[in-house]
């Protein structure tokens, strides 16, 4: 009979994913905590919280991160364009997860090289800023079939990372 494993019974394998998550103006403590947890789950090398000072003492961050904020390498309160320029210079492929007039679906996107990836996500209400979108050549969106054109930023990041990791064979 199948039984759910406890945390202590779960075998963990740490992998180097060569992937960085860049958050452009994400401010909600619940989303920040959720993104820490997500980054730990996917083995993300680093997460940048641009334009946001992360309040690690926040009970909401602690609760939603389930202590992963203590495990994930991160930098906060930094300018998004500075991060984009630094990562591009280091050879990362920047990808914007945003529905735009030039975006492709995650399903149709093809990875054509083995460069490390920097996935950019945006603010809960306004998305990725226009000045950042103008500097990133590849825009990707999640195909959605309901009446809403957006989803929660943490959920979108999870879908985006999973789709990219399937294409890069990280799983």
Label for each model-derived stretch:
Residues 52-54, 124, 144-148:
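Short, acidic/turn-prone active-site loops that include or flank metal/cofactor-
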Residues 35-37, 61-64, 109-112, 133-136, ...:
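Short, glycine/charged-enriched secondary-structure capping and boundary segments
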